[in-house]
């Protein structure tokens, strides 16, 4: 759907949208890119949070006057549009032999690094070692893949976190806080 653009950071990446994807719904979609870090292949997952349209010709004061009179200028309207998205990275996995282990985005991938959409098959592959510990809370908001979450008890062992964690659910009246709380409680049932 696109490539890593500039400027990007370890917390938010610029996404230069390919011409073949400009008419797709991208906001809310889950993306994936591969990059090298410390000599190993890493795979980063993130959600596309925004898409912006720029056309530098339409921003020119002289062209704005012409556009105000004509509505569009065939030589530059639409043809010179560029679409840039923003992607917030939420999980990173390092390739470790035939498995994947959790990691972090400790470097910024090179511009031009391809970004593709994620489906359930990709998530199942990355999370295969943790299959028995996952709870699917529904779908990724604004997308189609199932949303995998870990809900660990406070004890030790493979299903335990070894310490207590707290969770807060906040939102406006009618936003689904109670429904979300019920779904999370099901994970512990």
Feature map (PLM): residue ranges:
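Beta-strand-rich binding-surface signature
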Residues: 30, 45, 84, 132-134, ...
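Pre-P-loop entry segment of helicase/translocase ATPase cores
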Residues: 126-139
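Glycine-rich phosphate-binding loop of nucleotide-binding enzymes
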Residues: 137-189
């Amino acid at each position: 759907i696109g490539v890593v653009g500039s400027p990007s950071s370890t917390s938010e990446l610029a996404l230069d949208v390919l011409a073949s994807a400009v008419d797709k719904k991208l906001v809310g979609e889950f993306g994936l890119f591969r990059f090298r870090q410390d000599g190993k292949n890493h795979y980063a997952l993130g959600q596309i949070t925004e898409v912006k349209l720029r056309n530098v010709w339409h921003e020119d004061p002289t062209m704005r006057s012409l556009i105000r009179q004509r509505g569009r200028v065939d030589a530059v309207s639409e043809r010179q549009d560029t679409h840039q998205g923003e992607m917030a990275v939420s999980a990173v996995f390092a390739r470790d032999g035939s498995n994947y282990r959790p990691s972090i985005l400790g470097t910024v991938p090179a511009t031009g690094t391809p970004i593709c959409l994620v489906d359930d098959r990709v998530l199942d592959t990355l999370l295969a070692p943790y299959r028995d510990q996952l709870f699917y809370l529904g779908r990724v908001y604004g997308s189609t893949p199932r949303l995998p979450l870990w809900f660990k008890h406070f004890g030790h062992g493979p299903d335990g976190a070894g310490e207590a964690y707290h969770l807060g659910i906040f939102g406006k009246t009618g936003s689904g806080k109670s429904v979300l709380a019920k779904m999370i409680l099901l994970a512990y049932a």
